[in-house]
Swiss-Prot record:
<keyword id="KW-0793">Thylakoid</keyword>
<feature type="binding site" description="covalent">
    <location>
        <position position="56"/>
    </location>
    <ligand>
        <name>heme</name>
    </ligand>
</feature>
<dbReference type="GO" id="GO:0009535">
    <property type="term" value="C:chloroplast thylakoid membrane"/>
</dbReference>
<keyword id="KW-1133">Transmembrane helix</keyword>
<feature type="transmembrane region" description="Helical">
    <location>
        <begin position="286"/>
        <end position="306"/>
    </location>
</feature>
<protein>
    <recommendedName>
        <fullName>Cytochrome f</fullName>
    </recommendedName>
</protein>
<keyword id="KW-0472">Membrane</keyword>
<dbReference type="InterPro" id="IPR002325">
    <property type="entry name" value="Cyt_f"/>
</dbReference>
<keyword id="KW-0349">Heme</keyword>
<dbReference type="GO" id="GO:0009055">
    <property type="term" value="F:electron transfer activity"/>
</dbReference>
<keyword id="KW-0934">Plastid</keyword>
<feature type="binding site" description="covalent">
    <location>
        <position position="59"/>
    </location>
    <ligand>
        <name>heme</name>
    </ligand>
</feature>
<feature type="signal peptide">
    <location>
        <begin position="1"/>
        <end position="35"/>
    </location>
</feature>
<dbReference type="GO" id="GO:0005506">
    <property type="term" value="F:iron ion binding"/>
</dbReference>
<comment type="subunit">
    <text>The 4 large subunits of the cytochrome b6-f complex are cytochrome b6, subunit IV (17 kDa polypeptide, petD), cytochrome f and the Rieske protein, while the 4 small subunits are PetG, PetL, PetM and PetN. The complex functions as a dimer.</text>
</comment>
<keyword id="KW-0602">Photosynthesis</keyword>
<dbReference type="GO" id="GO:0020037">
    <property type="term" value="F:heme binding"/>
</dbReference>
Length: 320
């Protein structure tokens, strides 16, 4: 009987531990991952606003460079590479949601013309597969196959992200034409400053919500601070909460102004966007060009041969 109770107790403890661990993982992952390009899906039907601004900039407030490389022209129903480059100093460390320092992750959103989409695995060459590695791309929406997102992924390994893209064929898709098309890209490195719900992360500056005298700074047991500010005009106490991982710039007894920074800026990342152009080329036009160039070359050859023949005739006449 006692053995049965012991086994039952052990089973309950294991179940409880697994449940708690799972909850901690979900909460931590949500905190760390929020505000990456893939999470814009939750709040925006289209990642590119009418102004041309990509919505990831709403959460990643610092402006950083991003670049995209695509071929100038592609043929219908062919696979090509779109390489997104997200450069940054690999030595940098960012503040994580738990307040510790860690490596930067990166993410990207690629907005292709209608009809262009992620290439199916059986169409991707071994060379491109090697560049992709273990990356897993997703459509922004099930009905928007031309918009792809990736991230967060380790920045030290994937500061260059290769998207395998399948070009459409106007012969089978009447909505596609042989034209020049724009491609838009957005890329970030590091965590955002604002979560999708509008709240601040611990990767940004915290400012004073009122002016006055700092009467008390309480260091919280799990990290972070509670700063008590006494409003000089009415004596009202205001408590500003500072999350863990941030460095204070103020001290007790100090007089501060409204919106004065209470912490240093921990953000070392940022977001950038760019664009490129690609031409969907008609194979018949290419064949026509090749035929024209071949004709020119043949004409030049015949002209040279004719000239040599004429020179021989002239030379023979002079000998007579």
């Amino acid at each position: 009987m006692q053995t049965r109770n012991t086994l039952s107790w052990i089973r309950e403890e294991i179940t409880r531990s697994i449940s708690v661990s799972l909850m901690i993982y979900i909460i931590t992952w949500a905190s760390i991952s929020s505000a990456y390009p893939i999470f814009a899906q939750q709040n925006y039907e289209n990642p590119r606003e009418a102004t041309g601004r990509i919505v990831c900039a709403n959460c990643h407030l610092a402006n950083k460079p991003v670049d995209i490389e695509v071929p100038q022209t592609v043929l219908p129903d062919t696979v090509f590479e779109a390489v997104v480059k997200i450069p940054y100093d690999m030595q940098l460390k960012q503040v994580l949601a738990n307040g510790k320092k860690g490596a930067l992750n990166v993410g990207a959103v690629l907005i292709l013309p209608e009809g262009f989409e992620l290439a199916p695995p059986d169409r991707i060459s071994p060379e491109i597969k090697e560049k992709i590695g273990t990356l897993s791309f997703q459509n922004y929406r099930p009905n928007k196959k031309n918009i792809l997102v990736i991230g967060p992924v380790p920045g030290q390994k994937y500061s260059e992200i290769t998207f395998p893209i399948l070009a459409p064929d106007p012969a089978t898709n009447k909505d596609v034409h042989f034209l020049k098309y724009p491609i838009y890209v957005g890329g970030n490195r590091g965590r955002g400053q604002i979560y999708p719900d509008g709240s601040k992360s611990n990767n940004t500056v915290y400012n004073a919500t009122t002016g006055g005298i700092i009467s008390k700074i309480l260091r919280k047991e799990k990290g972070g601070y509670e700063i008590t500010i006494v409003d000089a005009s009415n004596g009202r106490e205001v408590i500003d909460i500072i999350p863990r991982g941030l460095e204070l710039l103020v001290s007790e007894g100090e007089s501060i102004k409204l919106d004065q920074p209470l912490t240093s800026n921990p953000n070392v990342g940022g977001f950038g966007q760019g664009d490129a152009e690609i031409v969907l080329q008609d194979p018949l036009r290419v064949q026509g060009l090749l035929f024209f160039l071949g004709s020119v070359v043949l004409a030049q050859i015949f002209l040279v041969l004719k000239k040599k023949q004429f020179e021989k005739v002239q030379l023979s006449e002079m000998n007579f």
